[in-house]
Amino acid sequence: VKSPIKHVESEFYAECPNVGTVGTMGGVTANEIPFIITQLEVGNTDENQNVIQDFGSTIWDFKTKFLSPRITVKPYTNNGTYKLYVKLYKDGVLKAGSSSPAGYSYTADVTISGRGEQVFTLTGWGSSTAGYWQMGDYRFEIWYGDYCIGSKSFKVN
């Protein structure tokens, strides 16, 4: 999977420590990856995905509700709905809840329509109560099948 990703300028490529490694979902080969992520930004949203702190801007702990990844993708296929597996780490520890898939924080579906660049805001992780996330170092990883296809490290201040 590294060769198709390398030809796209991607700000997170060096951050994805597990790119091309085997995950726990199985059943997907590198040739079946439907798109590559060319940009990944994180924003602070409410439970309805209204933006509280814009994607790519400073995130302040006292305002945090849902940490939401926004991905820009370059499709290899024309159409389809694809399940992504999302990992959210705080200070190196995977965040998971009782309904989280094993080894992941949550899942999100994206629907590709056409071959042009597309942007998706994935569901966030958090609470409707402001101040949910504390200061620290965080990282989102986006997985498709066995492959880490994007990652972004960020801070909550």
Show which residues each predicted segment covers.
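Short beta-strand elements
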Residues: 3-27, 147-157
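Proline/serine/threonine-rich low-complexity linkers at boundaries of modular beta-sandwich domains
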Residues: 27-37, 44
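Short, solvent-exposed, Trp/other aromatic-anchored flexible loops in extracytoplasmic proteins
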Residues: 1, 73-75, 104-137
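Surface-exposed loop/edge segments in extracytoplasmic proteins
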Residues: 93-105, 148-150
